[in-house]
Amino acid sequence: MKITREKFGTLSSGKKVFLYTLKAGELRLSITSLGAAWTSLRVPSRKTGRVDDVLLGFDTLDGYAHNQAAVGVTVGRFANRIGGACFSMNGKQYSLFKNDGAHSLHGGRRGFSKLLWKSEAYEEKDGVFVRFELNSPDGDEGYPGRLKAAVSYGLTKSNELVVDYQAKLDAPCPVNLTNHAYFNLAGEGEGDILSHELMLHASSFLEVDQTLIPTGKIVPVAGTPFDFKRRKPIKRDFDAVAGGYDHCFVVDGEAGTLRPCAEVFEETSGRTMRVFTTQPGVQFYSGNHIIELQGKAGSVYRIHDGFCLETQHFPDAPNKAAFPSAIFGPERDYHEKALFAFMW
């Protein structure tokens, strides 16, 4: 196991940005302190004999400083959408920054993804990790209360990428942290992901309106294009979903326990990724808005060249009383976990 840290660049403010590279098992993960973003994940393939980077991303700090597609970043205070960019809590209405039409997406104008996180690497018996910390002041992007976030990303000897999200607050506030990594198990720059085979441990999903805000209705997946209970190519029912997949699925089992969430298989490389989460939902996004994005080593990413599996609380939960509560505060700390296991 090994951890290295190097300077990734300098922001216009003069602050240094670091790039950490973790090695454990047969995986190698790189993460930058700007946006606590995953920049690279190298995974071997017995079938091809190659070790490929399976994450979309950028070669330079400038790519992450102007990252409009949220590539690889840690998202907060509230991942996904809040309808109308507002919510009411304890008799008071809070207005948020509108950055998705009439709605607030991924925390607002900058959220946590364009901020510089405090970072520290450490090693334990079974793995190597980086802990990122961030303080969000009262009123940040319109959200109430002071929040201290602590996110750990690491690799284990068992070829697992492990994730730990924590937040403490001095006042009640919606919280929903996730990572917005774009995967392509064939290797970044190797074309679209529509032939990847996906299975979701989800018997239902959240119905959404035309602007992707949940209606409040939880719909069984059986007999719909959203049925991934058995592994199938992403493209099989793709044409029946206008614009592609960008939907939250309700993960089977008890929220709060680490349980299977998703499995993805890519035939050319023979790679499989299994995802586990403690959260109630997972957003499956099929890269519908990747448009001529300049990526690594001269690659140009296009529509559907990567997919996201964003473990999270339900979108618009602050406005949907029937959804699991995403309000945390002094008497309820936020703490969620995820795990990505790789096989080849």
Positions of the model-derived regions?
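An exposed, glycine/acidic-rich loop-and-rim segment of catalytic or binding clefts
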Residues: 1-344
